């Protein structure tokens, strides 16, 4: 059985270390090590050996993905729905003009913290918390923001800090 994750504990830790994390990531941007992508991938893999997303699902409960047209088309097809019907049932346009869920938590998140559309989930969900992307220093603002929601993102930055 998966052990539940204390989301609030990680949120508080991320708040306490936000200034330190910003500094670490800013230094990476100024002078990224040649092997940064390799180090980041190793840390990402290690963190996700420790953190089981299904014991948390905080991203699914509190953050809504930005739906791209390809996401909408793929998911509507999965449900055998016409695009306008899918959008009318699940999506709205936010103040930035992005298509997002009408309400949170994610309507496709089950009580067991599993995604009912996992194989066709939006790209933003597949890539979250973006800690395995190349040139991680290009998304410092997003990485810092994600540490406040995602225990794995917090641990990623902590381990990155310790390795560099």
Task: Report the location of each language-model feature.
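Short loop/turn segments that flank or connect secondary-structure elements
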Residues: 1-164
């Amino acid at each position: 059985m998966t052990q539940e994750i204390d989301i609030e504990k990680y949120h508080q830790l991320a708040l306490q270390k936000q200034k330190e994390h910003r500094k670490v990531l800013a230094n990476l941007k100024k002078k990224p090590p040649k092997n940064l992508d390799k180090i980041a991938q190793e840390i990402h893999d290690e963190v996700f050996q420790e953190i089981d997303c299904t014991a948390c699902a905080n991203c699914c409960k509190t953050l809504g993905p930005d739906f791209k047209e390809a996401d909408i088309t793929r998911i509507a097809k999965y449900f055998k729905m016409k695009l306008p019907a899918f959008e009318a049932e699940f999506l709205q346009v936010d103040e930035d003009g992005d298509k997002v869920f009408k309400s949170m938590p994610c309507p496709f998140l089950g009580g067991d913290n599993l995604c009912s559309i996992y194989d066709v989930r939006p790209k933003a969900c597949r890539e979250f918390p973006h800690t395995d992307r190349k040139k991680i220093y290009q998304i410092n603002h997003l990485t810092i923001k994600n540490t406040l929601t995602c225990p794995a993102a917090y641990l990623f930055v902590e381990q990155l800090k310790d390795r560099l």
